[in-house]
Amino acid sequence: MSSENLSDTQMEYEDEKQDSQEKNANLVKGEEVKLKAKYPGLGQKPGGSDFLMKRLQKGQKYFDSGDYNMAKAKMKNKQLPVAGPDKNLVTGDHIPTPQDLPQRRSSLVTSKLAG
């Protein structure tokens, strides 16, 4: 008897669940109808004007003049030969010490502040 009660409650629960899902679906459809009435062109596929379609098919290369100038600069850089780094130039390998630095030259012009 208890198994029958359990199955009855499960069926009632599933029925209520189905009813609530149907109500939600009806509400959503109602909202969609309201929106379509308010904004009729919203659900259509984007077609646009003939001018827009022509521009899209053409395949615009540059977004603005900055993109054009950057592409132009890249073209110039490819044409120029790139000089390799100087092999005799040492950068960052040697840490100078006070003994390695050349002596400071004294200034010919004397300061007016020094008494």
Swiss-Prot record:
Keywords from the named record: Cell cycle, Cell division, Cytoplasm, Mitosis, Phosphoprotein, Protein phosphatase inhibitor
UniProt cross-references to InterPro entries, sorted A to Z: Endosulphine
GO molecular function, one term: protein phosphatase regulator activity
Post-translational modification, as annotated: Phosphorylation at Ser-65 by gwl during mitosis is essential for interaction with ppp2r2d (PR55-delta) and subsequent inactivation of PP2A.
Sequence segments annotated as region (Disordered): 1-27, 77-115
Location of this chain's protein in the cell: Cytoplasm
GO cellular component, one term: cytoplasm
Modified residues (Phosphoserine): 65
A Pfam family assignment: Endosulfine
Entry keyword Membrane: no
UniProt record, GO biological process: cell division; G2/M transition of mitotic cell cycle; mitotic cell cycle
Ranges of compositional bias, category Polar residues: 1-10, 104-115
Family, similarity comment: Belongs to the endosulfine family.
Protein task: Protein phosphatase inhibitor that specifically inhibits protein phosphatase 2A (PP2A) during mitosis.
PANTHER family assigned: ALPHA-ENDOSULFINE, ENDOSULFINE
Protein name: Alpha-endosulfine
